[in-house]
Structures are given as C-alpha cells and as structure tokens.
C-alpha cells in the first residue's frame, strides 16, 4: 500500500491551519444544547482556575518579603515579640492556603462537569449519527465511501466535541493565567514575555504539522480499519462462527487481522517516533530559554535590583507562565486535530438526503393498482454510458385482487424490482404508478402502510418474539392481540405458544436466556411480521419458504392466497409449485422481461419458463 498523499512541499506547516477551526463554534453549540448549565459551570471554574494562580504567585512574593522583613524586625527589636512579628506573615499564609483550596475546588469542578458532559455528549452525538442514518437512502448505504465516512464518524466523533470544548476552556484558563502572569512579568521586563513565547512556539508548530499528518493517515486507511472490524465480527458472531469452525477459517482470518494491524502499527510507529523526536528536540529550546531567564532573574537579584520575594515570584511566574503557554499552544494544536476529526462527523451529517416531497395518501385513480411504465434502473456510480442497467424497460400492470410471480435466475433483477416498488430505489428511467399517481408523489408513511414485505435476507432481531412481530407495524409494536393474529396468518403461533415465555421469549443468543430458532421458524416469524400491517394491500414475499419443509410450504401459500384474495400479491420463488397459481408470471433474465403470461400459456410457448419447469419437474420423478 502506498503512503498517504501529503501536502504540497510548497505549503507551510500552518497552511490552512486556522481555516479548519470552523467546527469549533459548532462543537461549542452542540455542548450548549446538551447542557447549558454545565457549560456555564465550566466557564466559571475556568475563570477561577485561570486567575488564582497569578494571585497565589503574588501572595507568595508577599510571604517571602514578609518573612525577610519579620526576621530583620525581630532581630533589631529591643523587646522582640515573635507573635507580633509573624502574625502578618501567617495571615498571608492563610490567604494563600485559601487561594490554593479554591484552585483545587475549581479543578475538581472542571473534572466532575467534564465527566458528566462526556456521557451526555457521547449519547447526543451517537443519536445524531443514528438519526442521520435513518434519513439516508439504500443506495447511499450501499456506497463504500459512505460506510468509510460512517466508520470514521463513529470511531472518533462522539468523543471529539467534548475534547474540543475541554481544550477550548483549558486554552481560556491558560490565557487568563498568561494575562495575569504577563502583568507581573512586564514589571520586570517586556523582554521576559518575548522569551516566554519564543521558547514555546517551535513545539507548537511541530505539533500542528504532525496533527495534520495523523489525521490524513486516519482518513486514508479507513477501508483497512473497516476490514479489521469486519473480521472481528466474523470471528466473534454466532451467525458466522459455524462456517468459521467447519471450514477452519480461524487461522486464515486471524492472520489477515494481524497483517492489517502490523501494517497500521508500522505507520503509527513511524509517525509517533517522528512526532516525539521533534517534540523532544524543540522542547529543549523551551527549556534553554527558561533557564536563560532563570539566570537573568538571579543576576538581577544579586545585583540588588530585585528583592528575594520578587525573585521567588518571577521565577514561579516564569515557570508557570512557560507551562501555561506551552499548554495553550498544545491546546490549540489539539483543537486543530479535534476539528479535523470533527470534519468526519459533519461530512457525514451533511450527506445530501433525497427530498421526501410526496404528500399523497390517495391516488388519482383509486383501485387502478400498480403500473411500471418503461422502468429502467442502474446503480449509481461508475460509467453511466458503459454500465448495463440492472433492470431495463420494465412495464407491467397489477390490479387489486391479482397475483404476480417473478421467475428468473439469481441476479436477474427480481429483488431490485421489489426495491423499486417499495421506493428503496428510484427508477433511472420511466415511472412507477400506484392508483394512477407517481410513486414519488406519495407520502412515504402512506406507502409503507399499504405495503407488507418479507425479503429473502430478512432481519433476525435479537428481541422478544412479540417485538420481532411488532416491528412490522410500529403503531402496534406492543399490541399482543395483533401479534397473535399475525402469527396465526404466518403459521408461527403453534411453536410460539410452546415456548416457555410465549411471545415474551427472548430470541437469539446475544442476550441471557435467549432461544435460537430453526431457519424455517425464523421464516415464519418474518412472514408473520409482514402480516402485521392490517391495511396493507400490497403483499410481497421474496423466497419466503426457502427453509421450510414441503408440507409447511404448501400450507403457507394456501394461507397466503386466502389472505391476499382482494390484495395485490407479488411472489418471488424458484419453486414452480408455488408460482404456477399466479395470475401473471414474469420471466426475467439479465434485467429484461423475456416472457410473461399464465402458467399454462407459458408452458404452451415452450420457452425459458417451460424449460425451467420441466427441469424442476424431472427432479421429482
């Protein structure tokens, strides 16, 4: 793998540095929305923690000078009274103790509020990510670049907003301290401030450059990171572990996992060694400048220009000032890095969303049913000229009370047609009508209420049995009567009632006391889920009985025909025993409808359908 692209050599390390801070304001706004009182508390504690160190240094000077004066007074007094001599100094010591206590209280307040905000903000950002996911189209989810964006956002962005805010308040605290220290240092010499800045600036420039390098590396290798996560899932999930063990894949996948880690670790190690080496070398400059100033203050004190207390104060102020400035510049560099990572979050949140402009709840021609008019579909991306459509020039009409069966090889476009019907995809060309109105003009909610679908790759929710049914109609999610009714239609009620907790039984192995079902039982659960929508007049079954035995399959379709008598029924199946009773059969090959008609008519035509039917029938002889 080639190294990540670097910035142009002509650009400076700080090129575009401050431009990236556009996300700081949004992060602060996010924290304000999460808890304005905690943010105000952070501001107050920051102010206290920023001002009081300089006050403590000034009081420290007064204590040292007070001790020197008390010693001289006590030594020169004719009738020395120790209590009288030390009382003013002890008051100053008590005052400094109070200041230190307030600083400790402010620091504890900062720590407590940051800890609480971390939990609140992490939850808020994760909810934002998941809410955004709910607005994205299926086509966007099938885009690997969006998955990379989502992976980057979820890995870092939930912690970065608070980190950015903490650094912002830390910067404010250090800036206040620096201002306070600056007032004291200027009394010594304005050059002292210049020395302070000059000592910390090289480290800041270095950190800014390496923060940008780390971020570019992070973005560039998202696919490798996603592969690591995928391999972890495959090796540790019950739905994949059977094949992993049977095929002996542990060693193969673990080695691939290790290889990816080794590659990523080597990149991290190179960057870390360069970053820390330069940080050490440039940090030595700061140390040298500090001790140069240290010597300067000592010389001035020996020369009599400064008192012992002033020397103590200036040394303390210079040391704390250097630490505060270094922390400030490091915070700015860290804020830069946090802003870079937050760009992942906002790039994801700003993904364009297909406008839901449809408002219709009733079509222009009620009862007309479904119409596909010259519908073609190509997946987005790639060369639109060279890319073959997945579906090409599909036209059909299905009236209420009619059934349609789709027949064809795997990958012929059958399931894609269903995704177009349910508006998971939009046609590239042509249009789909429901009751005489374009599908895009319908309200999404109204369309969902009219459609009951079971896909071949249905979801096996690690929830209770009843909840697995309830997801079919969220308005009746907790309605036990509706669960039972749907389960009877889907032939799941028999085995559900035999379970220990009935409809309250936990399914799957992810949670305690969960029960796993057979493939056929899961299909009955999914079928029952499709029947949850009482008002659905479009029923779609995509290979609904692939894991069922012949007797169960026959009963399922007998009930399906009864249930869908006055509805529009669409069935995808490779079993001709189930499709032969459909009012209309479409044979699809490579996205084209090559044959259409009833079972008898297609047999008379003696085309592809007849050939496939005879092949399957031969297997039963």
Regions found by a protein language model. Give the residues of each.
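Cytoplasmic coupling helices
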Residues: 112-134, 138, 196-236, 255, ...
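Cytosolic ends of transmembrane helices, especially the final helix of ABC transmembrane type-1 domains
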Residues: 220, 249, 273, 293, ...
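An intracellular "coupling" helix at the cytosolic face of ABC transporter transmembrane type-1 domains
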Residues: 33, 154-164, 217, 223, ...
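ABC-type nucleotide-binding domain
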Residues: 358, 363-621
């Amino acid at each position: 793998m080639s190294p990540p692209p670097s910035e142009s050599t002509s650009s400076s390390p700080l090129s575009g540095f401050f431009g990236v801070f556009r996300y700081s304001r949004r992060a602060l706004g996010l924290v304000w929305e999460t808890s304005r009182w905690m943010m105000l508390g952070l501001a107050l504690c920051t102010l206290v923690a920023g001002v009081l160190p300089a006050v403590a240094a000034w009081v420290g000077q007064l204590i040292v000078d007070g001790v020197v004066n008390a010693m001289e007074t006590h030594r020169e007094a004719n009738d020395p009274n120790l209590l009288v001599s030390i009382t003013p100094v002890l008051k100053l010591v008590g005052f400094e103790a109070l200041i230190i206590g307030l600083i400790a209280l402010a620091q504890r307040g900062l720590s407590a509020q940051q800890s609480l905000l971390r939990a609140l903000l992490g939850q808020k950002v994760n909810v934002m990510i998941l809410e955004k996911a709910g607005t994205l189209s299926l086509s966007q989810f099938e885009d690997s670049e969006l998955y990379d964006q989502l992976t980057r956002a979820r890995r870092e962005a939930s912690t970065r907003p608070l980190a950015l805010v903490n650094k912002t308040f830390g910067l404010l605290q250090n800036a206040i301290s620096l201002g306070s220290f600056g007032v004291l240092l200027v009394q010594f010499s304005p050059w002292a401030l210049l020395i302070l800045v000059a000592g910390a600036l090289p480290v800041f420039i270095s950190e800014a450059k390496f923060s940008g390098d780390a971020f570019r590396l992070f973005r560039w290798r998202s696919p490798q990171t996603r592969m690591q996560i995928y391999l972890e899932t495959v090796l540790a999930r019950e739905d994949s572990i059977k094949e992993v063990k049977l095929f002996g894949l542990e060693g193969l996948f673990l080695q691939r996992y290790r290889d990816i880690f080794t590659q990523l670790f080597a990149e991290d190690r190179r960057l870390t060694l360069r970053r820390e080496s330069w940080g050490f070398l440039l940090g030595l400059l700061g140390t040298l400048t500090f001790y140069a100033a240290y010597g300067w203050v000592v010389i001035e004190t020996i020369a009599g220009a400064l008192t012992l207390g002033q020397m103590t104060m200036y040394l303390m102020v210079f040391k704390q000032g250097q630490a505060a400035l270094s922390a400030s510049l490091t915070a700015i560099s860290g804020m830069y890095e946090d802003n870079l990572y937050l760009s992942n979050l906002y790039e994801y949140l700003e993904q364009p969303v297909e406008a839901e402009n449809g408002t219709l709840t009733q079509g222009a021609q009620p009862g007309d049913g479904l119409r596909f008019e010259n519908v073609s579909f190509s997946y987005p991306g790639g060369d639109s000229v060279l890319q073959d459509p997945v579906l090409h020039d599909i036209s059909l009409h299905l009236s209420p009370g009619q059934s349609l069966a789709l027949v064809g090889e795997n990958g012929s476009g059958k399931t894609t047609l269903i995704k177009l019907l349910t508006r998971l995809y939009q046609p590239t060309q042509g249009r789909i009508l429901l009751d005489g109105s374009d599908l895009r003009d319908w309200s999404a909610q109204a369309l969902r209420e009219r459609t009951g679908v079971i896909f071949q790759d249905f979801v096996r929710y690690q929830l209770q049995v009843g909840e697995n049914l309830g997801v079919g109609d969220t308005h009746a999610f907790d309605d036990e009567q509706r669960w039972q009714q749907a389960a009877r239609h889907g032939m799941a009620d028999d085995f559900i009632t035999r379970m220990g907790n009935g409809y309250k039984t936990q399914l799957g192995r992810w949670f305690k006391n969960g029960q796993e079902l057979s493939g056929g039982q899961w299909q009955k659960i999914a079928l029952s889920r499709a029947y949850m929508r009482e008002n659905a007049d479009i029923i779609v079954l995509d290979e609904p009985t692939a894991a069922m035995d012949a007797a169960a399959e026959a009963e399922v379709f007998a009930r399906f025909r009864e249930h869908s008598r006055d509805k529009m029924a669409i069935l995808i199946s490779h079993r001709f025993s189930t499709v032969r009773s459909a009012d209309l059969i479409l044979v699809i090959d490579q996205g084209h409808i090559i044959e259409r008609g009833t079972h008898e008519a297609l047999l008379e035509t003696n085309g592809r359908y007849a050939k496939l039917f005879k092949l399957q029938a031969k297997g039963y002889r």
